Swiss-Prot record:
Segments of this protein annotated with the region G1 motif: 40-47
GO BP field: defense response to virus; receptor internalization; synaptic vesicle budding from presynaptic endocytic zone membrane
Region (G4 motif): 210-213
Top-level taxonomic group: Eukaryota
GO cellular component, one term: presynapse
Disulfide bonds: none
Segments for region (G2 motif): 65-67
UniProt-annotated location(s): Cytoplasm
SMART domains, per the entry: DYNc, GED
PANTHER family from the UniProt entry: DYNAMIN (PTHR11566), INTERFERON-INDUCED GTP-BINDING PROTEIN MX-RELATED (PTHR11566:SF225)
Molecular-function GO terms, alphabetical: GTP binding; GTPase activity; microtubule binding
Protein name, UniProt field: Interferon-induced GTP-binding protein Mx
Length: 626
């Protein structure tokens, strides 16, 4: 094989080793790594290309041969050094003694992971080959695309395979190596269509043409045009190779002999010799190009990879903090652990009611919801006042006729005033109680959410806290409702300080005079100042003025008092009682084991997070050292 210059070789292996190390750590479970994925339709010659690159025989045959993603790690050794192979899957590793063992070992691994037969699996098989005859390169071979299910295959096998391929090639970190036979119409190949769907500009797609010896006479120039990027444009371009056919395999033509035969084929071909001269033909040239592409791709991806690892680390550490370290086994330490948990929760409950930051890290803010509810209450009072003002203008005359006694015209009937004010205030009582219940539900949900965040993994603690929250909500809501109804009973006593009422009355009179002056003009204003009308209409106008003035005072009082009652009972008192009851619960030490019984799967979640944290920290160390 053609060798790369010494300076480049010094850069190639470390780059590829870095990504291989990250993949072997399992980092790909957390984020996508730079890779070259090999895809092609069934019988596209995909396996032959990989055999030619790796120097080992891979599973062959009709139907689906590659049934699991195969990570093919090739490491170039110095001349004279021995061949080395290793296969790894599902945590087990097997060293291979001879290249001839590879095919059977892959079949065994596939049977173990995907079942005996023709099913497929998403699990990765890793095959490492070290030899003087391979390039420094890592590829991921994916199952060939099946169009129709054959005997023994699931009906949706084609859909399953496409789904598996899409999961790899959709990632921006993946270069798609699309294998297409020369003797088919390239535009109809499913593999190229799939690559174009996720990479429409061909930024990360490289085409490989196979089987050039099988093209029909007269179509050779079309093949040359495809390789020259003149038919379907790909920014990474095309290569063309000729690998061993079934006849040569049957005749036991070695891979080395096949490479010599390939070289002669392109060099001497009437049409394809130009591709050979331009460095776009033969497996060795393909190996060089793929190595170059992978290294450049890795170098471009490293800054983003570092950022992703840092983000994942931060996210994982935050999740681990939420899960905690789990309860200790010692009884005394276990009690302290429970006390810490409960104390942190109750302190957060108090903080929630005062609008301060929470220790659990949640961004719960009940005040924004309360502010909206109280603003709606204020708007309801204003709207009720506007409707009341419009209504009394129509109804005050009826009331005057009904309740007026022996007074002469011009005297205001206090009974009419009192009846109308009380009736309006009564209409505000039920909306206030409704607002209380809505806010009670909001606060209850916030406390329950806080319990879930504070007691992650401890279902009995959550259940106990929820029961207390529900009971306290009912109790405090009942107390608050009683206070509200008492407030409305008091509001039926028509009262305010004389000065307050006089000021409100003067303000209202001035507003109405200004409105009337604007409506009727300055002449009317002058007439009004010197003429004192003492007819029935004037009396009614005066009565309306008094009613509107008093309602304004009462509504302002309710706008503040109702929210104060709700906040005091549903937030302040609820949080204080929750704190008392949760701390009182700690007195029952016999209940401690029940409360600290962990969720059955929490241990595995914590172990999974710890494992992720460990591999991400190792990954970060690899990147720092690189």
């Amino acid at each position: 094989m053609n060798t790369l210059n010494q300076q480049y070789e010094e850069k190639v292996r470390p780059c590829i080793d870095l990504i291989d190390s990250l993949r072997s750590l399992g980092v790909e479970k957390d984020l996508a790594l730079p890779a070259i994925a090999v895809i092609g339709d069934q019988s596209s010659g995909k396996s032959s290309v990989l055999e030619a690159l790796s120097g080992v025989a891979l599973p062959r045959g009709s139907g689906i041969v590659t049934r699991c993603p195969l990570e093919l790690k090739m490491k170039r050794k110095k001349e004279g050094e021995e061949w080395y192979g290793k296969i790894s899957y599902r945590g087990c590793e097997k060293e291979l003694e001879d290249p001839s063992d590879v095919e059977n070992k892959i079949r065994e691994a596939q049977d173990e992971m995907a079942g005996v037969g023709v099913g497929i699996s998403d699990d990765l098989i890793s095959l490492e080959i070290a030899s003087p005859d391979v390039p420094d390169l890592t590829l991921i071979d994916l199952p060939g695309i099946a169009r129709v299910a054959v005997k023994g295959q699931p009906e949706d096998i084609g859909k399953q395979i496409k789904g598996l391929i899409q999961r790899f090639i959709t990632r921006q970190e993946t270069i798609s190596l699309v294998v297409v036979p020369c003797n088919v119409d390239i535009a109809t190949t499913e593999a190229l269509k799939m690559a174009q769907e996720v990479d429409p500009d061909g930024e990360r797609t490289l085409g490989i043409l196979t089987k050039p010896d099988l093209v029909d006479k007269g179509t050779e120039e079309t093949v040359v045009e495809i390789v020259h990027n003149e038919v379907i444009h790909l920014k990474k371009g095309y290569m063309i190779v000729r690998c061993r056919g079934q006849k040569e395999i049957t005749e036991k033509v070695s891979l080395t002999e096949a490479l010599e035969s390939e070289k002669a084929f392109f060099r001497d071909h009437v049409h394809f010799h130009t591709l050979y001269n331009e460095g776009q033909a033969t497996v060795p040239k393909l190996a060089e190009k793929l190595t170059l592409e992978l290294v450049h791709h890795i170098e471009r991806s490293l800054p983003r990879l570092e950022e992703q690892i840092e983000d994942k680390l931060e996210q994982t550490q935050a999740e681990l903090e939420r899960y905690g370290s789990g309860p200790p086994s010692d009884a005394t330490e276990k009690l302290f652990f429970l006390i810490d948990k409960v104390t942190a929760f109750t302190q957060d409950a108090i903080s929630l009611t005062t609008g301060e930051d929470l220790k659990c890290g949640d961004k719960l803010n009940v005040f924004s919801a309360l502010r909206r509810e109280f603003a709606r209450w204020n708007a309801h009072l204003d709207l009720s006042g506007e409707k009341f003002n419009k209504r009394i203008e129509k109804e005050v005359e009826n009331y005057e006729e009904k309740y007026r006694g022996r007074e002469l015209p011009g005297f205001i009937n206090y009974k009419t005033f009192e009846v109308m004010v009380k009736e309006q205030i009564k209409q505000l009582e039920e909306p206030a109680v409704k607002r209380l219940k809505e806010i009670g539900d909001t606060v209850r949900k916030a406390f329950i959410q806080l319990a879930h965040s504070s007691f992650i993994g401890f279902p009995n603690l959550i259940k106990t806290a929820k029961a207390k929250i529900e009971a306290i909500k009912q109790e405090k809501e009942s107390t608050a409702e009683s206070m509200l109804r008492t407030q409305f009973k008091m509001e039926l006593i028509v009262y305010t300080q004389d000065r307050t009422y006089s000021n409100s009355l003067s303000d209202r009179k001035r507003e109405e005079d200004e409105e009337e002056d604007t409506r009727k003009g300055p002449v009317f204003a002058k007439q009004r100042s010197i003429v004192y009308r003492m007819d029935n209409h004037a009396t009614l106008q005066e009565l309306m003025l008094h009613i509107k003035s008093y309602y304004k005072i009462a509504s302002q009082r309710l706008a503040d008092q109702i929210p104060l009652v709700i906040r005091y009972q549903m937030l302040q008192e609820s949080a204080a009682q929750l704190q008392r009851e949760m701390l009182q619960m700690l007195q029952d030490k016999e209940n401690m084991d029940f409360l600290l019984k962990e969720d059955c799967d929490i241990g595995s979640k914590r172990a999974g997070l710890q494992s992720r944290l460990k591999r991400l920290m190792k990954a970060r160390a690899y990147l720092v050292e690189f």
